[in-house]
Amino acid sequence: MANLTETAYYTRRTINWSILAVISYIVLRFFWSVFVAVWLEIFPPKPPPPNFRFGKLPALKFSEASPSAQFTYRLETIVGNVPVASESAAVYFMPKPAANLLALSRTQDFATRLGLDPSPIEETKSVYRFEDVTAPLRRLRYDIVSNNFILRYGFEQDTGLFSDRNIPGVDAAIAEGKAMLQTFALYGTDLSQGTSKVSFLKLVGDKLLGTTSLSQADAVRVDFFRKNVSGMRLFPPNPDEGQAVFVFSGSKNEKKKILQIAYTLWPIDYETQGTYALKPSSTAWEELQAGRVYIARYPTSAATNVVIRQVYLGYYDSFDPQMYLQPVFVFEGDYGFLAYVPAVAPEWVE
């Protein structure tokens, strides 16, 4: 009897100690995980040294020179100064599409599917125009090498089409744009994993200008933006313009319903990349102040003193072909101001 009591006693103690050990392990593991996370946040491991795989990079070519000398800048970030940026970043190869003997034939098929006359009109060695015999204001310009194109209906000469008010809402416009991209095999992961934005347009004279609501709109615009790369956003020359853009009217006529499709998407080889040293963010700030900057969006205010609220890294995705996807410092300020400064260390740019 004593042996049974003693056995039960030690069994209970063993169970209690086992439970305590398990609880202690869970608690200790939790606190260790928190400690490691906090430690890495405060003392992050240094990234591997840059490999400068492509040698010296060609200088970024921005769309046009921007007159920035008229502005003076004041820094008012959350931290009170220019945030310290990473010492290096990835640079990606952007392969140049090769000419293809079947390219023109495929483009003619594309034009036919859009309801255009497949007879090409040569504008340059790579750019062809296609007309619509039943809707003369509608035409397609297509680059058979890059596969970038713009389809447009000249609404300026036919403003009566806006009397129809069957304008798609936000969700319908996104769905319609997405469906068209999928139909023509243009909705790859670069766009499908990216973001979209809808804006409303109102006819003023013969121009479509931004307005605040669907009820006031004569057309709706959908911009599809490329996905982030290495956790950083891609910035076109115009940060409000996506790589794929649709403008829909409310017309019941199918050929007047789509006022514009603009598609400009240069390929990125995500498997071919190098790492490059970056200039300090403080140096980028000095270049901004000195006017060595591309202003992508001017402030809506007439003031010439711009307050900078955010400074961070992104990638510049030009509408013109460039050999490499390179990082830039992005400066965001009051009243919509946005500017880019090349980020790669100057000794690695030519």
What kind of feature is each model-predicted range?
Residues 31, 151, 177, 222-224, ...:
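Generic structural hydrophobic/aromatic packing signal, biased to beta-strands
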Residues 2-4, 306-307, 312-350:
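Activation/maturation switch segments at domain boundaries
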Residues 9-10, 25, 73, 92, ...:
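Sequence-level detector for tyrosine residue identity
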